[in-house]
């Protein structure tokens, strides 16, 4: 997660060489709606209930049941599936889906969301220091894998939900699967998954709420002298860069 976190910082620093899609307006719109925080905060709150009875005891019961049922079997697909919704933020538009924002705006949105996610997840993990159910480390709460994939799923919903609800369904199905596999693999308590999902959704919405401000900031840095555009042919997909002198 830390490597991807620093990659996002690099993207933010290199956007000035990419960017006209953010130069459309000097006006700052307001994307924030108070009701948008209800669901993610509810999920985070549900996750914290794992520290008190009766859910605290229920966590051990679920872990013990799964350990007996699963035996030594483990899967690793969750390590890769967590990134599918994130890749879809760009991949769906290359396949013809209509996104709400252009590539630059989506990158700003994603970068802001991931920075928020990294800050929230790591600050909680290393403050709470909850032991994992398998005893391997003291950073179980909240689930970082789940937060990452739910952030991606929510960004897919924001960007492509108006084009087709099935994009949202697919992304959230992948996210739920990742969360379930984290519990199956004995890497997280089930309440960690609730909290991780809430953090991921909240982070995605922070990226969306902040987009008018990050767009304006990048506009001031870059001016309006360049733009990027996607293209696709029989050889594959690519991004083009056009410069105006």
Task: Describe the role of every protein-language-model region.
Residues 47-50, 89, 93, 179-182, ...:
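Structural signal for membrane-spanning alpha-helices in multi-pass inner-membrane proteins
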Residues 109-114, 197:
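Alpha-helical transmembrane segments of multi-pass membrane proteins, especially transporters
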Residues 20-89, 125-134:
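N-terminal transmembrane-helix/juxtamembrane module of multi-pass inner/ER membrane proteins
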Residues 85-92, 96, 116:
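Generic short alpha-helical segment signal, independent of protein family or function
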Residues 74-77, 107, 111, 143:
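Hydrophobic alpha-helical transmembrane segments of multi-pass membrane proteins
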């Amino acid at each position: 997660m830390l490597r991807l976190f620093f990659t996002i910082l690099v993207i933010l620093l290199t956007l000035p060489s990419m960017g006209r899609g953010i130069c459309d307006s000097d006006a700052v719109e307001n994307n924030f709606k108070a009701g948008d925080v209800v669901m993610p905060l509810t999920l985070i709150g549900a996750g914290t209930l794992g520290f008190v009875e009766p859910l605290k005891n229920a966590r051990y019961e679920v872990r013990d049941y799964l350990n007996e049922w699963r035996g030594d079997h483990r899967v690793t697909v969750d390590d890769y599936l967590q990134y599918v919704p994130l890749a879809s933020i760009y991949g769906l538009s290359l396949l013809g889906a209509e996104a709400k924002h252009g590539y630059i705006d989506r990158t700003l949105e994603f970068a802001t969301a991931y920075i928020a996610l990294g800050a929230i997840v790591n600050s909680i993990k290393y403050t709470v220091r909850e032991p994992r159910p398998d005893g391997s480390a003291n950073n179980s709460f909240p689930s970082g894998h789940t937060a990452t994939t739910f952030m991606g799923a929510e960004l897919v919903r924001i960007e492509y939900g108006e084009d087709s609800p099935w994009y949202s369904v697919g992304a959230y199905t992948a996210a739920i699967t990742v969360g379930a596999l984290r519990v199956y693999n004995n890497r997280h308590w089930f309440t960690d998954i609730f909290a991780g999902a809430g953090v991921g959704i909240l982070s995605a919405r922070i990226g969306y709420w902040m987009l008018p401000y990050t767009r304006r900031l990048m506009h001031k840095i870059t001016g309006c002298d360049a733009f990027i555009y996607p293209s696709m042919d029989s050889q594959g997909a690519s991004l083009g860069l056009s410069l105006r002198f």
